[in-house]
Amino acid sequence: GAVIVGRDGRIVEQFGALVFGLFGKFDLFADPALPDSAFWSEQSAQRRMKNYHAMIDSGERSISSPALIQQWLWGANQRYQPTLTAYNLAFDFGKCRNTRINLGIFSRSFCLMKAAKKVIGIRADYQQFCYDQDLLTAKKRKPQMTADAMAKFIIGNDLADEPHTALEDARD
């Protein structure tokens, strides 16, 4: 998913696609060790797949070739010359590269996660928030630096978890 946002915070364009040749070919990520209620459980993977099919049926998503996705990105880059950003941009670069989508077409980019770690992650009140809310890494039990944890600290703990559906993660 991609969202073009103006300097005033208004969404100018958005695009949500599932990659042709990949969607439905591979199972969605799931950890069989997790309980059914966990987001990354096998039960959740089935719910998430149903949700993707509902998005296709409603027109919220298309199934698009990497070439079509690249064309949309190229056009958006030509129209707006945006700064490419994402939370954990290196992850997105890698996933897109694996599907032959070139994010290197953008002349400016920065990683929101790196910025959040430098500005928010080092704050004592953020770290205490993570301990209080049990937003800790599994192995080392250190404060999480995830988009969810950061957003809950900034906006409030009542904020719903991100849906991990690319477009909504970027837009909402």
At which residue positions do the language-model features occur?
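A short, structured active-site edge motif that brings together acidic residues
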Residues: 18-21, 106-120
